[in-house]
């Protein structure tokens, strides 16, 4: 694919107002792309104002209505686009359904939420297929980049892998374990990604998937996403959610956006790509943060919980020349953003 600025084409980004999608659109616009973003309500000026403030937005950004669960609703957005970045995913939020399950297995999925199986699985799988069906109708399409998650790789029973061998893109999380523990978020990522691979293989669509770990960094949307809220809580001394993390991979939000663009543009990119800067135990993270930000009430240690030890290999992504920001840069940028928005007092 031609990477010259003057020949950048049009691409579509689903779920445009989200944490990752906003950063992806920012980077795409800075790279010279014309971007069509899909949102549920293009008229919601408050929710979308941050997108229109991005450099190049007034000249090269278009926002259109689309809904994951509506067949054909992505047709208009995707038609004429050379590339599609499918980053939209079901919104995790408290459920009024008395049958909703509280996912307390956060050591596996990294998300603490109340949600029913239907609220997460159906939109994730059907939504992905709806987007891909629209891609199939587009003769201009070159490549689709799907945002998956390392929760589609690392949810494994402790005796199911060798902790001394880093997990790589050939690894898949256990569907059976997810169903047994009723952890729907990682299950949705597994099933949606597998459905995407099957559909694209059957229909001749060039697909690449990106699997980020726990994403940290400045938030462009006005409301903090769940991961940013978790980080804010930790920096204020609220440890309940992080107590469950155990061992977790971390990556800068800007790196995740840049990774998506790299695997879209790089002709030889193929298959899955784990996007992760570092993997740390809770106490390793606590020690680092306490030393770097001594004025914040971050706990010096977390409760020791028995968790499977694992590491992640990023050699495939690094072979394309990718370099990750450090854990220190992630938190420096995140904290600066939280201070600027008034969520934290200046350090």
Language-model-detected regions and their locations in the chain:
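Alpha-helical substrate-binding/gating segment
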Residues: 3-4, 231-273
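Glycine/proline-rich active-site loop of Rossmann-fold NAD(P)-dependent oxidoreductases
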Residues: 202-206, 217-231, 263-273
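N-terminal Rossmann NAD(P)H-binding glycine-rich loop of SDR-like oxidoreductase domains
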Residues: 3-35
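Active-site "gating" loop of Rossmann-like NAD(P)-dependent oxidoreductase/epimerase domains
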Residues: 108-111, 149-182, 201, 220-221, ...
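Mid/C-terminal beta-alpha module of Rossmann-like enzyme folds, strongest
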Residues: 257-307, 311, 334-338, 342-347
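NAD(P)H-binding glycine-rich loop region in Rossmannoid oxidoreductase-like domains
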Residues: 22, 41-126, 138
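Active-site Tyr-X1-5-Lys
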Residues: 137, 177-208
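Amphipathic terminal alpha-helices
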Residues: 2-4, 30, 327-347
């Amino acid at each position: 694919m031609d990477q010259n600025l003057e020949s950048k084409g049009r691409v579509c980004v689903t779920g445009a107002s989200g944490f990752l999608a906003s950063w992806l659109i920012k980077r795409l616009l800075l790279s010279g792309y014309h971007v069509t973003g899909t949102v549920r309500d293009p008229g919601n000026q408050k929710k979308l104002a941050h997108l229109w403030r991005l450099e190049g937005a007034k000249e090269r950004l278009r926002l259109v209505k689309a809904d994951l669960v509506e067949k054909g609703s992505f047709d208009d957005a995707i038609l004429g686009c050379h590339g599609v970045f499918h980053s939209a995913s079901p919104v995790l939020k408290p459920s009024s359904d008395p049958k909703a399950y509280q996912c307390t297995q956060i050591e596996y999925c990294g998300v603490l939420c109340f949600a029913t199986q239907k609220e997460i699985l159906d939109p994730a799988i059907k939504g992905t297929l709806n987007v891909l069906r629209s891609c199939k109708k587009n003769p201009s399409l070159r490549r689709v980049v799907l945002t998956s998650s390392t929760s589609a790789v690392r949810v494994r029973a402790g005796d199911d892998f060798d902790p001394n061998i880093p997990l790589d893109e050939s690894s898949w999380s256990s569907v059976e374990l997810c169903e047994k523990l009723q952890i729907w978020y990682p299950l949705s990522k597994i099933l949606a990604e597998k459905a995407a691979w099957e559909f694209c293989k059957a229909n001749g669509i060039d697909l690449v998937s990106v699997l980020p770990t726990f994403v940290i960094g400045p938030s462009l949307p006005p409301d903090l996403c769940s991961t940013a809220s978790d980080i804010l809580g930790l920096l204020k001394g609220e440890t309940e959610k992080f107590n469950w993390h155990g061992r977790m991979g971390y990556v800068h939000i800007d790196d995740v956006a840049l990774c998506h663009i790299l695997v879209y543009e790089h002709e030889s990119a193929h298959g899955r790509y784990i996007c992760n800067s570092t993997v740390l135990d809770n106490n390793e993270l606590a020690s680092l943060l306490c030393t770097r930000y001594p004025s914040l009430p971050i706990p010096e240690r977390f409760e020791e919980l028995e968790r499977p030890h694992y590491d992640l290999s990023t050699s495939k992504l690094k072979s394309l020349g990718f370099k990750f920001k450090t854990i220190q840069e992630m938190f420096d940028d995140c904290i600066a953003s939280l201070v600027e928005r008034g969520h934290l007092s200046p350090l």
